[in-house]
From Swiss-Prot:
Main localization, broad class: secreted
GO terms assigned for molecular function: toxin activity
Cystine crosslinks: 28-65, 29-57, 41-51
Protein's name according to its UniProt entry: Probable thionin-2.3
Length: 135
């Protein structure tokens, strides 16, 4: 019984540590156009590491962007809430569908990805205007 408790404790600690590392990750880009390219790639449901490589952006865990990569986030506006909500929603909920997209020849997965992306857009824009107005 003690062995199971130790294994369970190590598993929980590993999950907590990996969650902290994921939350601390920041993507920094050399220009606004590469930042936009990165965001478009993510909104299509691709993995963050793939989008960083394709757009020329860098993932960092230090909390700030290195020199030459000053664009770590969008400018502060009401649209930022929507953009980041959509990016997070699409990448977490629609990512698995996107990887299936390449294997599907019938087009059914394309429809599912479109619906998933639209659902994320609806969820994210529904209450964001109220939240931005109250801040």
């Amino acid at each position: 019984m003690e062995g199971k408790t130790v294994i369970f404790s190590v598993l929980v600690m590993g999950l907590v540590i990996s969650q902290i590392q994921v939350e601390a990750q920041k993507t920094c880009c050399p220009s606004q156009s590469t930042r936009k390219e990165f965001e478009d790639c993510i909104s299509e449901g691709n993995l963050q590491i793939l989008c960083s490589a394709e757009s020329g952006c860098r993932d960092t865990y230090v909390g700030y962007c290195p020199s030459g990569f000053p664009y770590g986030s969008l400018t502060n506006s009401g649209d930022v809430v929507n953009v980041y909500c959509k990016l997070g929603c699409v990448s977490s909920l629609c990512g698995a569908l996107t990887s299936l997209q390449k294997l599907d020849t019938s087009g059914k997965v394309n429809v599912a990805v479109e619906r998933c992306t639209k659902a994320c857009s609806t969820i994210c824009t529904k209450g964001s205007k109220t939240a931005v107005e109250t801040v």
